Design a protein with these regions (language model features):
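Aromatic- and carboxylate-lined catalytic core of secreted/periplasmic carbohydrate-active enzymes
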Residues: 230-303, 317
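Charged, low-complexity, helix-prone segments enriched in Lys/Glu/Asp/Gln
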Residues: 83, 245-247, 266, 278-285, ...
Length: 365
């Protein structure tokens, strides 16, 4: 709307025409005027936000289709190679005025694959690796539990040549980049709203992944989570999501304890005489997640009954029964918290049981 009429050459050439309205459209990243204008806008941003240490400079969200097909862009190579070239040019323009500011771009969907040749990144560029890998198993479980071989997807890559952790290491090797961060999705209801009422607890998987991120060289992790209406998680989601979100936050702050230790400490503070039983309940949920081998990647959860099978539901019911047997020993906030967690499980169980199975009927129980 702002530039296309006067400068169509700034936008992606797709199927022989400049088209900023094609799905997943991109700019023409080889265009020097696009580079100049981008640098000017970032310069203005840093001047208006002097305490900001970093700005995001990534391709538009989307897949492969909208990347420019002009001769200059095609000469640069793959989408990943195009974006490395573009971000390096912007970093060079800004370096003199802003030597300590970083430009971050996502290794994500069309830029998942590493460059095919050595392409060193400017020292002020940060790679953010978006965790396109299994949601139920750690990134170092080998190799990423085979998700890149066993499944084909209708979004992002149709297949993955390298599992996530190996792919990230390859990126670092080919770009000599030492500024690393990670984007992880903690929004289980984003793709399927039914998960807004179903627990998803990662347990020690969460802190194990954080150790892998740290060994990769990550300076920080960004957890894409709620409360956010777009993710179907709101302020009211905290009682259901706290074992997921709290462990992620605590593990970034203190990398020594495991998730089990973090949850154990929290349960002692929250649930009084039911602390150990509540911990067993959360660890049961985490174990069910870890035993799930259904198709799940990034923020796309498996179908509820694929994780919460009848056998898994029975295990959680036994853990819940052990908690109920202790309610007579509780009072005040401790009792209210326990009753809240038990009610959330009963609601989740009803949702799972009534969710359509693959044959169109409710899940079998």
């Amino acid at each position: 709307e702002q530039y296309f009429q006067e400068h169509p050459e700034w936008y992606c050439l797709v199927d022989g025409r400049r088209n900023p309205y094609v799905e997943w459209w991109q700019m023409c990243y080889s265009n020097e005027e696009v580079q100049r204008l981008t640098a000017e806008k970032l310069d203005r941003y840093f001047r208006e936000h002097p305490y900001c240490t970093q700005a995001a400079l990534s391709a538009n969200d989307g897949y492969f289709e909208g990347f420019c097909e002009c001769e200059d862009c095609r000469r640069l190579g793959t989408p990943s190679e195009v974006m490395i070239y573009f971000v390096n040019r912007i970093a060079e323009r800004l370096e003199k005025e802003w030597p300590d500011k970083q430009l971050m771009f996502f290794v994500y969907f069309p830029t998942y694959d590493p460059p095919r040749r050595k392409m060193p990144l400017h020292k002020n560029v940060m790679l953010m690796f978006c965790k396109e890998s299994c949601m139920c198993h750690s990134v170092d479980s080998g190799p990423d539990c085979g998700y890149h071989v066993r499944y084909r997807y209708e979004f992002g890559h149709n297949h993955y040549d390298l599992p996530w952790l190996e792919n990230a290491r390859r990126w670092i090797e080919m770009t000599d980049c030492r500024n690393i961060s990670v984007w992880d999705w903690y929004c289980p209801a984003a793709a399927n709203p039914v998960w807004k009422d179903i627990p998803w607890v990662q347990g020690d998987l969460a802190t194990r992944n954080q150790r892998c991120f740290r060994e990769l060289g990550a300076q920080y992790v960004y957890y894409d989570q709620g409360p956010a209406e777009a993710f179907n998680d709101t302020e009211s989601s905290y009682p259901l999501r706290w074992p997921l979100w709290y462990v992620g936050a605590y593990g970034m702050w203190d990398n020594r304890p495991t998730a089990t230790q973090i949850l154990s400490d929290a349960c002692q503070k929250l649930f009084g005489a039911a602390a150990d039983a509540m911990l067993s309940y959360y660890l049961c949920l985490a174990d069910i997640n870890g035993r799930c081998n259904a198709k799940a990647i990034a923020w796309h959860m498996p179908e509820p009954q694929e994780m919460y099978t009848p056998e898994a539901v029975a295990l959680v019911d036994r853990a819940a029964a052990a908690i109920r047997s202790l309610c007579g020993e509780l009072s005040g906030n401790e009792l209210r918290r326990v009753e809240n967690q038990l009610a959330l499980w009963e609601k989740a169980k009803a949702v799972i049981q009534n969710y359509p199975s693959g044959d169109g009927g409710p899940a079998a129980h």
